[in-house]
């Protein structure tokens, strides 16, 4: 893995917009921190409450906000895909953070993105022994996992076959956090 911090910085900043998922029941943070101007709070599960904790919500435009209890921060990713990445002329970088989990990037790191042709920035992988499949078995209901496997087998059989190999690995990238070039994130979604 290459650390973004070690790459040469560029001289021009590309457009970047990273949405930080916030939920109305989030616990208060013990310490506050200043967010970069390119990080925008986005309330997830906004369809489930009248309480507002952010100006922007996943309940605007094309959304699955009401399904937040099942999909957590993925309702933010869906909203981003349908309401930002589909816009004509959209470019630059987009991403997703959590209210208490962010990638440690400074302004110089943002300058490194375009200069070095970076497609995506991810967190460091998390180790789970003995493998990813056993980790998921502890946290995902069997019926939900089986439904996902059926859908994957039907809609993306090549990914279904890859999952068998990937699932036996001891590490994965947690929390659906990333920053990616517009087209890369759009393809991912």
Where do the model's predicted regions map?
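ER/Golgi luminal nucleotide-sugar-dependent glycosyltransferases, focusing on the catalytic module
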Residues: 1-189
């Amino acid at each position: 893995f290459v650390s973004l911090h070690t790459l040469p910085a560029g001289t021009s900043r590309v457009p970047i917009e990273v949405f930080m998922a916030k939920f109305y029941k989030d616990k208060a943070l013990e310490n506050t921190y200043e967010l970069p101007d390119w990080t925008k709070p986005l309330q997830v599960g906004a369809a489930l409450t009248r309480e507002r904790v952010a100006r922007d919500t996943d309940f605007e435009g094309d959304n699955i906000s009401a399904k937040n209890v099942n999909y957590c921060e993925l309702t933010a990713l869906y909203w981003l895909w349908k309401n930002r990445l589909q816009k004509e002329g959209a470019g630059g970088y987009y991403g997703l953070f959590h209210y208490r989990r962010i990638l440690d990037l400074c302004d110089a790191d943002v300058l490194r993105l375009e200069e070095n042709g970076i497609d995506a920035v991810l967190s460091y992988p998390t180790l789970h022994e003995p493998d990813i499949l056993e980790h998921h078995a502890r946290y995902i209901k069997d019926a939900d996992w089986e439904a996902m496997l059926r859908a994957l087998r039907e809609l993306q059989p090549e990914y279904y076959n890859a999952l068998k190999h990937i699932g036996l690995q001891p590490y994965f990238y947690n929390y659906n956090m990333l920053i990616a070039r517009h087209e890369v994130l759009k393809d991912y979604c």
